[in-house]
Amino acid sequence: MYKLEVQDLHKRYGSHEVLKGVSLAAKAGDVISIIGSSGSGKSTFLRCINLLEQPHAGKILLNGEELKLVPGRDGALKAADSRQLQRMRSRLSMVFQHFNLWSHMSALENVIEAPVHVLGVSKKEAIEKAEHYLAKVGVAHRKDAYPAHMSGGEQQRVAIARALAVEPEVMLFDEPTSALDPELVGEVLKVMQDLAQEGRTMVVVTHEMGFAREVSNQLVFLHKGLVEEHGCPKEVLANPQSDRLKQFLSGSLK
């Protein structure tokens, strides 16, 4: 059984179709990197998986359980069961490009927020878990700091700890290093590599070709809302079949 399965996902904005039937399947421990040019639909696809964006067609399954979707007035699909959506979202955590930490909360408070208020974990247990994950990503010493007083790399590592604190079955990363200064990228990629080596199931939208090649076991190249190529990262990157991917890599691959 797949941990995460997305079938024939479509999304449009007005008459512009951003996703034209994208499918993806991740087994336990898979690390899938999604690459592509700006505007290819990468981030939209990721955001549709947990309904931050509403798709217009397709199926989303987590551990074989299908997310129940019904058409809304605008034609987009919405959750038919809000409790199911909340439960599935807690098993499908997301790390955002711009961190999305609560500015009025400390690092520790950011990490315990969802376990306490969404999952109903006791505050004592949530704090113990938060301190564990903050230490795991190397920012235990910053637990009382507020986002404005942290570097971008520290904020993103706190965001990863926050995502881990709900004990997710699948982690989604939306260009987690693209908002960072170049010297801070490595510290975040190292945390992600460690998570991959632990056997975490991860779907990563990224421009970091080294990570895609060395850490992922699947690579997806999206172009204009369609999967142009999909396969073993080292093989796809070393021997691209499509002219579009060759052109993309000529400007991206270091």
Swiss-Prot record:
Q: Where in the cell is it found?
A: Cell inner membrane
Q: Which species?
A: Pseudomonas aeruginosa (strain ATCC 15692 / DSM 22644 / CIP 104116 / JCM 14847 / LMG 12228 / 1C / PRS 101 / PAO1)
Which SUPFAM superfamilies does the entry mention? P-loop containing nucleoside triphosphate hydrolases (SSF52540)
Q: Which UniProt keywords apply?
A: Amino-acid transport, ATP-binding, Cell inner membrane, Cell membrane, Membrane, Nucleotide-binding, Transport
Q: Which GO terms describe its molecular function?
A: ABC-type amino acid transporter activity; ATP binding; ATP hydrolysis activity
The entry's function note states: Part of the arginine-inducible binding-protein-dependent transport system for arginine and ornithine. Probably responsible for energy coupling to the transport system.
Gene that this polypeptide is encoded by: aotP
Protein name, entry field: Arginine/ornithine transport ATP-binding protein AotP
Annotated PANTHER family: AMINO ACID IMPORT ATP-BINDING PROTEIN, L-CYSTINE IMPORT ATP-BINDING PROTEIN TCYN
